[in-house]
Amino acid sequence: DDLKNRIANIVVGYTKNQEPVKVSQLNAEGAITALLRDAFQPNLVQTLENNPAFMHGGPFANIAHGCNSVMATKSALKMADYVVTEAGFGADLGAEKFFNIKCRKAGLSPDAVVLVATTKALKMHGGIKKEDLKEENVQAIKDGCKNLERHIQNIAKFGVPVTVGINEYFTDTKDEHQAIIDFCEAHGVACKISSHWENGGEGAADLASHVADLVDKNESSFETLYDDDMSLWDKTRHIATSIYGAEDIVAE
């Protein structure tokens, strides 16, 4: 019934008078729900290293909520001691929606966050052109860490402990990595290098071990950013000002 009601409330278009047209007005919610009956079951697949994984839903956060289905996450929690799920498109967009929407509606309480960083992205944030990103530039890394700092601050608003994971590439240098590590240490955040891109699971072992220890400490005090009883406009303003640094929001 919950799924059917949500489908019924989907806006599919607008009338000439700019009134929203919902699926319920087309009497199509029953048929759509029936079509989703089989698709609603998570797909159990295996990684290249024969580890189990659920692939179920994957909308990007710039167009939707940016995370997989509640069914997949809850199924995984029943089958494993630790569950890793991706909330893509940055801590300002993907993580915010994961926390405020998915976790709220599904009753989930995350134990830890891995904030993924790359030297290329940080150098780009530091003002380096795309064609020059393969060249070592420690100063650009330091300048780009201002962006990383904001993501760390955003996650802190939800009360979940965070670790920065450096997604290592073969063009990275030790000095660039050290600049990121030093920055994180100065802000009281652990930082681990992960070479899974090149070395698979073995390359992520140190990061995984650290996160498991962090989870076992049970230090998370997760809370959502806003209350359900706030108006849609107030919720939007609160997200814009607290996560994105906006002064206010305007709509016509």
Model features per residue range: what roles?
Residues 1-252:
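Flexible phosphate-sensing "switch/lid" loops adjacent to ATP/NTP-binding sites
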